[in-house]
A protein has these predicted regions:
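Conserved MFS/SLC helix-loop-helix module at the cytosolic interface between two early adjacent transmembrane helices
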Residues: 67-103, 276
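Helix-loop-helix hairpin linking two adjacent transmembrane segments in secondary transporters
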Residues: 146-190
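Central cavity-lining transmembrane alpha-helices of secondary-active solute carriers
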Residues: 55-73, 256-271
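C-terminal membrane-cytosol helix-exit motif in multi-pass small-molecule transporters
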Residues: 179-197, 431-439
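Cytoplasmic helix-loop-helix junction between adjacent transmembrane helices
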Residues: 111-152
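Short amphipathic helix-loop junctions that connect adjacent transmembrane helices
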Residues: 27-51, 232-252
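Structural signature of the two symmetry-related core transmembrane helices
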Residues: 83-98, 178, 283-298
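Helix-breaking motifs and short loop linkers at transmembrane-helix boundaries and internal kinks
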Residues: 80, 101-107, 118, 280, ...
């Protein structure tokens, strides 16, 4: 196995570790809301509503990411990206070990902020190294594979988080995450070559005025609101109580709504990344973003679709006679195997449409993401600052990722659960419209196929 291939596999492993930890917290978010029971409070004479506190559960994470982007990206270009990656992975190990001690909204928000720094650093360094090691004509393909590793972790993380939470609570979940992070750290230390590139000065200043990056940013700025709202509120919609506008599903059912998007995205990204290398990346950004917005508008209609189509409220399978009645170990939540096994129970007919729509969201985004990342990597590599180009990409995303959870929390409490998805879908559609207009106006009609 050649040295470059080994390095790609190590970086895929690191993306796996990052994705596993990140999605676990997304999956568990509705249960932290139920467990911590946030309520309005007054700080320095300013009243913070329940909806804003719920929003801070995510905004604490994204705000820390925003603060961390520039120094981490600068450090990656100025010094050894491998060393920076090892440091942020070590921080991640400590952060996930702290989650079991959470006992209030304040402590949860604070630890989520630390998680944001670890996730941002890991993502920036792994993607920068993948883009740097890969050849120009194959970047979207390799980035798609790296993202597929992250989505694979998201699938396992969602299922294991929901299942372990239902059986044991929060504690054991984070032990699993810590072990995976340690394995990733060891693999990075032993198998990833030191990065010898050094960029003097401050590459952000030049890349910030790059015409292609500015054009992409007009779309990405708006699209960040869409994805943050939709991805965050699909599991919240599935898991919170009906009184709060949700469907009140159990942990495993909520996990499946998250897994559906990750699974389809994971399966498609290596293929769509390869296609975008050959047929034009701007076209894939536009098509994927538009499809995502349209699908998001349909998500609140899941209960209506389930009722019209007559979907069942549970999924039951018959157990073979040789297994029925078998005694299970004492540490499992059930004593024995019954003659019928309820795979998914206590859900409404909305469940299957919601899972299907979540899967469609993953397919739509699989067209956009590797193409977008490859475009930023191309510009960064040509101008000598690939970590900084990904840093700009992250910075453009940050306003949406910080403000959208607060907006979503307010909409959920003050307007309706459905309004969160309508606003999210609208942001995606205005984003692709702006992108197309600017692309054609300033770069020509052929740019949609040539980029």
């Amino acid at each position: 196995m050649d040295d470059k291939r080994v390095q790609f596999w190590v970086l895929y492993l690191t993306r796996f570790a990052e994705g596993f930890g990140f999605i676990t917290l997304i999956t568990l978010l509705p249960y932290y809301i139920n467990s911590l029971d946030p309520s309005s409070t007054t700080v320095l004479g300013i009243t913070i509503s329940t909806g804003l506190i719920i929003g801070l559960y995510t905004t604490g994470f994204t705000l820390a990411q925003t603060v961390a982007v520039v120094p981490l990206a600068w450090a990656g270009d100025r010094f050894d990206k491998r060393l920076v990656l090892l440091i942020v992975l070590g921080v991640g190990v400590g952060v996930y070990a702290l989650f079991p001690v959470v006992d209030s909204s304040a402590s949860f928000i604070a630890i989520r902020a630390l998680q944001g720094i670890a996730v941002t650093g890991t993502g920036l360094m792994t993607l920068s190294l993948v883009g740097q090691i890969a050849d120009v004509g194959t970047r979207a393909n390799y980035i798609g594979k790296a993202n597929a590793a992250s989505f694979g972790a998201s699938i396992l993380g969602s299922i294991s988080a929901g299942t372990l939470y239902d059986a044991f609570g929060f504690g054991p979940i984070f032990l699993v995450i810590v072990c995976i992070m340690v394995v990733a750290w060891v693999g990075t230390f032993w198998f990833l070559n030191p990065d010898e590139t050094r960029i003097e000065g401050f590459p952000f200043s030049g890349l910030a005025l790059n015409r292609r990056i500015l054009t992409l940013s007009t779309f990405r700025f708006q699209y960040a609101f869409a994805v943050t709202l939709v991805r965050t509120w699909v599991p919240i919609f599935a898991g919170v109580s009906a009184a709060e506008g949700g469907l009140a599903y159990g942990g495993f059912a909520v996990a499946l709504t998250v897994v559906a998007e990750k699974f389809t995205n994971m399966c498609c990204q290596p293929f769509t990344g390869r296609l975008s290398d050959g047929y034009g990346r701007a076209l894939f950004v536009f098509a994927g973003g538009a499809a995502y917005g349209l699908i998001a508008l349909v998500v609140p209609l899941s209960p209506w679709l389930g009722g019209v189509l007559g979907f069942p409220a549970e999924l039951v399978v018959t157990v073979p006679g040789v297994l029925a009645g078998s005694t299970l170990p004492a540490w499992l939540p059930y004593d024995s195997i019954t003659d019928q096994l309820v795979l998914i129970g206590e859900v409404s007919p909305a469940f299957f449409p919601l899972v299907f729509l979540s899967g469609l969201l993953g397919i739509a985004d699989s067209f956009r993401e590797p193409a977008s990342m490859a475009l930023f990597a191309d510009e960064g590599t040509e101008e000598g600052g690939v970590a900084s180009s990904f840093g700009i990409r992250e910075l453009v995303w940050r306003p949406g990722s910080v403000i959208a959870p607060l907006l979503g929390g307010w909409l959920m409490v003050e307007v309706s659960m459905a309004s969160v998805f309508y606003v999210g879908g609208a942001f995606a559609l205005t984003g692709v419209t702006t992108f197309l207009v600017i692309l054609v106006r300033f770069h020509g009609r052929s740019a949609l196929l040539e980029w």
